């Protein structure tokens, strides 16, 4: 279980949200909504261990992730706005790089197949369209073999077919006792089975 307890985060000395609480059990799918600048990205970065909270804590299996990051990091994968790919490398070289880090080279073929990357596998990443770049970045979800997926606006720059593909992968991960947390501006019909957390409910200054 991933749990936030009385979580408050700030950016540039500005408090974004205060006393946020939720629990994500295995098989959870959670959508964090709110307008730009409301703190969605900061929350998901905090959940990933990249942004220590002002107060409160994030716990995974009962342990504070900031006290014990080495045991938490292998359990999760975070996909942010930046795709974390090298323009000078081909798609296959980027994926192989991630697989070496996670020691999951056996998952490369499956990731390429599931995300239908074969047409661009030998093309340099910097030559791809925005949609293909995002799709390649999302291959890290499968390469990581992680229980927790944290994705900032996963459907950005994707066409409807690719969005459906990603939704199917999210559902499969959830059904396999995974936890999936994503951000978006609002809920949609396709995300109706996600639990929604509106970050604006916690946009209050610390006192």
Residue ranges and their predicted role:
Residues 48:
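Helix-to-loop junction immediately C-terminal to a conserved catalytic motif
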Residues 53-67, 71-72:
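Conserved ABC transporter NBD signature motif
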Residues 82, 87-103:
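Q-loop/switch helix immediately C-terminal to the Walker
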Residues 97, 124-133:
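Conserved ABC ATPase signature
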Residues 105-121:
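Conserved ABC ATPase "signature" region
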Residues 149-153:
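Catalytic Walker B motif of ABC-type/P-loop ATPase nucleotide-binding domains
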């Amino acid at each position: 279980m991933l749990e936030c307890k009385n979580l408050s985060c700030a950016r540039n000395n500005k408090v974004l949200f205060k006393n946020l609480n939720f629990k994500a059990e295995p098989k959870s799918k959670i959508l964090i909504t709110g307008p730009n600048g409301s703190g969605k990205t900061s929350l998901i970065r905090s959940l990933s261990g990249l942004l220590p909270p002002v107060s409160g804590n994030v716990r995974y299996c009962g342990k504070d992730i900031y006290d014990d990051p080495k045991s938490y990091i292998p359990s999760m994968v975070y996909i942010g706005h930046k795709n974390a790919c090298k323009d000078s490398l081909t798609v296959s070289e980027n994926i192989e790089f991630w697989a070496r880090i996670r020691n999951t080279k056996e998952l490369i073929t499956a990731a390429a197949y599931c995300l239908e990357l074969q047409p661009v596998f030998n093309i340099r990443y910097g030559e791809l369209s925005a949609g293909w770049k995002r799709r390649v970045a999302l291959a890290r979800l499968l390469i990581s073999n992680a229980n927790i997926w944290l994705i900032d606006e996963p459907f950005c720059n994707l066409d409807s077919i690719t969005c459906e593909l990603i939704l199917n992968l999210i559902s499969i991960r959830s059904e396999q006792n995974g936890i999936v947390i994503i951000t978006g501006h609002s809920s949609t019909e396709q995300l109706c089975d996600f639990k929604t957390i509106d970050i604006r409910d916690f946009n209050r200054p610390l006192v």
